[in-house]
A protein has these predicted regions:
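Secondary-structure transition motifs
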Residues: 61-176, 270-287, 310-324, 357
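Amphipathic hydrophobic-ligand
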Residues: 41-44, 71-89, 101, 128, ...
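Elongated, acidic membrane-bridging lipid-handling scaffolds
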Residues: 128-233, 308, 313, 319-320, ...
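Extended terminal
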Residues: 2-12, 210, 223, 242-244, ...
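Short beta-strand micro-motifs enriched in acidic
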Residues: 88-94, 114, 177-182, 210-212, ...
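Outer-membrane beta-barrel architecture
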Residues: 99-103, 145, 189, 217-219, ...
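N-terminal amphipathic/hydrophobic interface segments
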Residues: 10-72, 108
């Protein structure tokens, strides 16, 4: 090899090294700029620990929106947080005009929601209650799958007591397929499972079906199994002198939402319900009268239908005649089966609606 050839090879190698260094520097600058943009979008209460490249995509570490950024008192330390978010792009979309993201995975996520004494749902107030600014809509983006792993959701209900009742869902794993941004149009398949924490025992929660985040239309099947009635006591017990000592709840709900109107036939089963002692009804111990409502399996079963407007927290509960007789006797005992069905049913509906609004706001709706 002559000297000229060697010189050209050296020049090409040096140029390649310089290009690689320049590309790395440019990419590092772009990642740091992205970190600043994300923090700006989250608002003054938001922060991001780091953004880097990993697992064939972009990794966001330590995303958080503090609770002190909310207008008025917020019942939780954080509005939102995520230990790790991985965004994996579809490289084939680089050659097209539409951006496609293959998957977004959130690990160690957390979201808090508050229902006010007036029944209004609040979540991510730092984002959703921020004054709107005029601006061009974001680019069209298609997301194949959003997945939530080992996350938690806390629902604070100030409409039933003060301080607010806290319901905590842990070990939350969920997936949402087919998401179009920024319009959120089209049906997405939702699959969610989690554990509802209780004072005496933990119950299981399952939610499956289709939802359109833009219109909030949905067809969902909700199942609760072995949920602690002590935790749900504010929904179940109306009389101040009555308390719940033990018991569990199973519930099945098939809900349909069209144009913000909900219709959800369902059934609930109370197993092993035992009220606090020391109170009577018509001269008899309340637990003795409760026993009269139970079947041979120590259960009280109720069929019901929730109907109403999602924008109105007050839902109508319709029951058949036989159920009304049992419910009327329960009302006299200071036990509200209607309140339990309304409270748990509307809480799950509010949570789904709230998460939909959160997704829309976070992704630029």
């Amino acid at each position: 090899m002559n000297n000229a050839a060697k010189r050209w090879i050296a020049i090409l190698v040096a140029a390649a090294v310089l290009i690689a260094v320049a590309a790395y520097a440019a990419f590092h600058f772009a990642v740091q700029a992205l970190k600043g943009k994300v923090e700006e979008a989250l608002g003054p209460a938001g922060e991001v620990a780091a953004i880097r490249v990993a697992d064939g995509g972009v990794e966001i570490i330590g995303l958080r929106i503090r609770g002190d950024g909310a207008q008025g008192a917020w019942p939780a330390e954080d509005q939102l947080r995520a230990e790790r978010i991985v965004v994996v792009p579809d490289l084939r979309s680089l050659l097209s005009s539409r951006v496609r993201i293959r998957a977004i995975t959130v690990e160690g996520g957390y979201l808090s929601l508050l229902r006010t004494p007036a029944g209004r749902l609040r979540l991510l107030p730092s984002l959703l209650e921020r004054p709107k600014t005029d601006g061009a809509p974001g680019p069209a983006i298609e997301i194949g799958r959003v997945e939530l792993r080992d996350s938690a959701l806390e629902f604070f209900d100030a409409s039933v007591r003060k301080p607010p009742l806290k319901l905590r869902l842990e070990q939350l794993n969920a997936s949402l397929d087919r998401l179009s941004l920024p319009d959120l149009a089209g049906k997405s398949k939702l699959d969610l499972v989690g554990v509802l924490k209780g004072a005496r025992r933990d119950g299981k929660v399952s939610l499956k079906g289709d939802i359109e985040l833009a219109s909030k239309d949905s067809v969902l099947t909700t199942q609760l199994r072995g949920v602690d009635l002590v935790t749900l006591q504010p929904y179940l017990v109306k009389a101040t002198e009555t308390g719940v000592r033990r018991g569990t709840l199973d519930m099945d709900l098939k809900s349909t939402v069209q144009r913000h109107r909900l219709r959800a036939p369902g059934s609930l089963t109370l197993t092993g319900l035992e009220l606090a002692s020391g109170s009577t009804f018509m001269g008899m111990p309340r637990n003795a009268v409760v026993s009269m409502l139970k079947n041979r399996n120590d259960q009280i079963k109720v069929n019901f239908t929730l109907e109403g407007n999602l924008d109105d927290p007050k839902f109508a509960l319709n029951e058949n005649f036989a159920t009304r007789v049992g419910a009327s006797m329960a009302e006299g005992l200071g036990v509200s089966l209607e309140g339990l069905a309304k409270g748990v049913g509307s809480a799950s509906s509010s949570a789904v609606k709230g998460v939909g609004e959160a997704v829309g706001k976070l992704f630029g709706k």
